[in-house]
């Protein structure tokens, strides 16, 4: 069972000056253990203004973590409140991201599998307009005979031609 991180404005995500009697750590950051989804949420709630995402396995925890941050009143590094929109489909989530970025905002999306394939049409327009949208993809296999929630890169490769730069990471 994967846990959804609880993020609040008091969670200490932004490093503060050390308390009296404490020394600076050699490597700044938060000493913790987490999975890849939690690491993504940690970064995205600090550097974006909004997320448009529709929950789909294996990216549900990322959207849930971002939504938890919004619900708890968390603000990004610039002190701006976060916005989370969960529309009726992945296609609409990508369209929200396109509009938010076109208006000048920093926006992210969390998706995987068939959801990524569904939003392919919008990915072309985002790339064509050179909009700064970040897609966090919990890569997963696609099959024609049944749903598959296992790891794979079929979904990522199915949108390889849309004009986006891609960065992959196997371990956090």
Name every feature range the model reports, one short phrase each.
Residues 170-172:
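Conserved small/polar residues in nucleotide/adenosyl-binding loops
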Residues 160-168:
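Acidic/polar active-site rim loop that often engages polyanionic ligands
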């Amino acid at each position: 069972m994967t846990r959804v991180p609880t993020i609040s404005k008091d969670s200490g995500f932004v490093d503060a000056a050390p308390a009296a009697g404490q020394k600076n750590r050699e490597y700044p950051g938060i000493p913790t253990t987490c999975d890849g989804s939690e690491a993504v949420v940690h970064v995205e709630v600090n550097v974006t203004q909004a997320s448009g995402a529709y929950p789909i396995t294996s990216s549900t925890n990322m959207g849930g973590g971002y939504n938890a941050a919004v619900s708890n009143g968390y603000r990004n590094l610039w002190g701006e409140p976060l916005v989370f929109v969960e529309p009726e489909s992945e296609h609409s989530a990508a369209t929200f991201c396109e509009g938010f970025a076109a208006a000048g905002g920093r926006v992210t999306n969390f998706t995987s599998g068939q959801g990524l394939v569904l939003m392919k049409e919008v990915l072309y327009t985002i790339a064509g307009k050179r909009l700064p949208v970040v897609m966090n993809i919990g890569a997963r296999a696609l099959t024609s005979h049944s749903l598959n929630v296992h790891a794979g890169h079929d979904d990522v490769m199915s949108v390889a031609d849309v004009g986006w730069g891609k960065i992959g990471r196997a371990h956090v």
